[in-house]
């Protein structure tokens, strides 16, 4: 794949937040002029092979009309509640011949039952919806940020989970293997591909595509070693370098003059793809939602 796009978009975009608390009003989500086809055309013209969408970030808001929660696009002004950003982007990818993938945050700061076994069942039902309604996906992205404070149905407290066991990830792997056997599974330790241990877009000058099986898990405390891999590893888990074209992952107007330059992006390419990894470059969608800049300029959604 070499290079592919990340798109962070959701309620955070309209509320100037990075990590939504889970209490933002869905009525604030109204991308009246959104054009997913133009995003994809620009990605294609820039040589990217695919795109990963934040279908649900930590705030719990869903960009598809899930039947599992009211905290979703069905209850927004967008297309009078009949919109589906996941479908619009996946259809655009099919039309222009690049691959589509989804990010699904395991952590959910909106759901009242987060931290209980019932939430895990809810999470897997969401995953099943995404795996069965939108065609082929090339990657499933599980974020390592899990547990902490949140709205949690109005409780407004902090919740701690056992990151090694709470989500029962082998259950996810089995579901994905059955429903989307071609999909690569991303998490801190894979099993398909791994986090590189930083969000700066680079891997170590020596970067092994191996980890010691069973050692790395979401929230792994020695994450900085992931930029190098394990020279004595026995499981193939290639590195993926994720980085945003702006300081933040979601759009913030005060960062309009902080877009990475062509020289900076070129350096990131050499320090990621050139260091035996792939480059996942994030584009924060802004409030105008009109277009992505031409690929001959620094790439950003403007």
Task: Please report, for each region that a protein language model flagged, where it lies by residue.
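Hydrophobic alpha-helical segments, chiefly the membrane-spanning helices
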Residues: 301-302
């Amino acid at each position: 794949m070499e290079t592919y796009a990340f798109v962070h978009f959701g309620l955070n975009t309209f509320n100037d937040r990075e990590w939504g608390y889970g209490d933002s009003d869905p009525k604030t989500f109204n991308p009246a002029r959104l054009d997913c086809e133009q995003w994809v055309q620009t990605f294609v013209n820039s040589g990217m092979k695919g795109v990963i969408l934040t279908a649900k970030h930590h705030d719990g808001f869903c960009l598809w009309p899930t039947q599992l929660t009211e905290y979703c696009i069905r209850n927004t002004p967008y297309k009078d509640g009949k919109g589906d950003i996941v479908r619009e982007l996946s259809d655009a990818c099919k039309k222009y011949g690049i691959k589509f993938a989804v990010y699904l945050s395991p952590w959910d700061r909106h759901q009242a039952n987060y931290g209980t076994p019932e939430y895990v069942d809810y999470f897997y039902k969401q995953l099943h919806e995404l795996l069965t309604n939108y065609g082929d996906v090339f990657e499933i992205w599980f974020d390592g940020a899990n547990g902490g404070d949140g709205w949690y149905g109005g409780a407004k407290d902090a919740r701690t989970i056992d990151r090694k066991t709470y989500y029962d990830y082998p259950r996810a792997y089995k579901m994905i293997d059955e429903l989307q056997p071609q999909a690569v599974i991303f998490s801190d330790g894979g099993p398909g591909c791994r986090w590189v241990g930083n969000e700066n877009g680079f891997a170590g000058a020596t970067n092994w595509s191996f980890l010691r099986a069973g050692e790395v898990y979401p929230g792994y405390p020695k994450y900085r070693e992931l930029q190098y891999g394990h020279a004595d590893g026995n499981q193939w888990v290639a590195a993926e370098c994720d980085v945003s074209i702006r300081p933040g992952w979601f759009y913030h107007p005060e960062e309009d003059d902080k877009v990475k330059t062509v020289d900076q992006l070129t350096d990131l390419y050499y320090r990621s793809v050139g260091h035996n990894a792939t480059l996942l470059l994030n584009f924060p969608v802004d409030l105008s939602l009109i277009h992505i800049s031409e690929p001959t300029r620094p790439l950003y959604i403007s």
